[in-house]
């Protein structure tokens, strides 16, 4: 009995939250007498503990979801659930949270966040953001780095399975580019696009995106 209590005491916050989800809301089956909408609402409420209400995260650990592309959100939630997205933060925070999400619940969660108003970045004029804008709009031809806007859109709004980057936390974007470059987050296209970026160039383009 003492060992069980000790295990509960040593659960990390993400693991504890994951247990709450697994027990309470994320099976994707509506409670008796309830509805699928109720299940989605309950799950979104749990999501808000990290991503904040309406997906307007204030912590760079957790991405802003408000206004994100629905198709992208669906793909990522399915990847978390199926453990095919395996970067360290995905494993720590999202594998447990998404473990029992059904496809209909995932669709409802994605639709909810996609319908929210995106967080606007804070425009900052600096040499760093100017350099980042150039990478975003023109790429780095000498290093075979394409313009980010060619896929993500002129305003970094994304399209379908291609994510919105505008107004996202700089630290989060930096972490993702580093994960793509190292293949900790598997994506062949993004690996090719990011593997030759220097830390300074990553800092520049992510600083610019955070201002949009």
PLM regions and their residue ranges:
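Predominantly soluble domains enriched in secretory-pathway, periplasmic, or organellar proteins
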Residues: 27-31, 36, 74, 115, ...
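The canonical Cys-X-X-Cys-His
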Residues: 47-54, 109, 145-155, 205
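The feature marks the first
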Residues: 33-83
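Bacterial N-terminal signal peptides
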Residues: 14-24
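Axial heme c-ligation environment in periplasmic c-type cytochrome domains
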Residues: 58-64, 80-117, 122, 159-164, ...
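Electrostatic cytochrome c docking/interface patches
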Residues: 26-44, 56-61, 114-141
């Amino acid at each position: 009995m003492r060992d069980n209590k000790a295990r509960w005491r040593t659960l990390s916050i993400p693991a504890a939250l994951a247990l709450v989800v697994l027990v309470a809301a994320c099976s994707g089956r509506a409670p008796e007498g309830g509805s699928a909408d109720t299940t989605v609402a309950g799950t979104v409420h749990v999501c808000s503990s990290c991503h904040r209400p309406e997906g307007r995260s204030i912590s760079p650990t957790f991405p802003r979801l408000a206004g994100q592309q629905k198709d992208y959100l669906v793909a990522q939630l399915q990847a978390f659930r199926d453990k095919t997205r395996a970067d360290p933060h995905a494993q720590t925070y999202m594998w447990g949270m998404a473990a029992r999400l059904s496809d209909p619940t995932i669709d409802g969660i994605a639709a909810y966040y996609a319908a929210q108003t995106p967080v606007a970045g804070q425009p900052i004029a600096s040499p760093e953001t100017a350099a980042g804008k150039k990478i975003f709009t023109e790429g780095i031809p000498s290093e075979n780095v394409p313009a980010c806007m060619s896929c993500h859109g002129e305003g970094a709004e994304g399209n379908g399975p291609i994510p919105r980057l505008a107004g996202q936390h700089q630290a989060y974007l930096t972490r993702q580019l580093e994960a793509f470059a190292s293949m900790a987050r598997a994506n062949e296209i993004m690996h090719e696009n990011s593997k030759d970026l220097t830390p300074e160039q990553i800092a520049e383009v992510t600083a610019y995106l955070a201002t949009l």
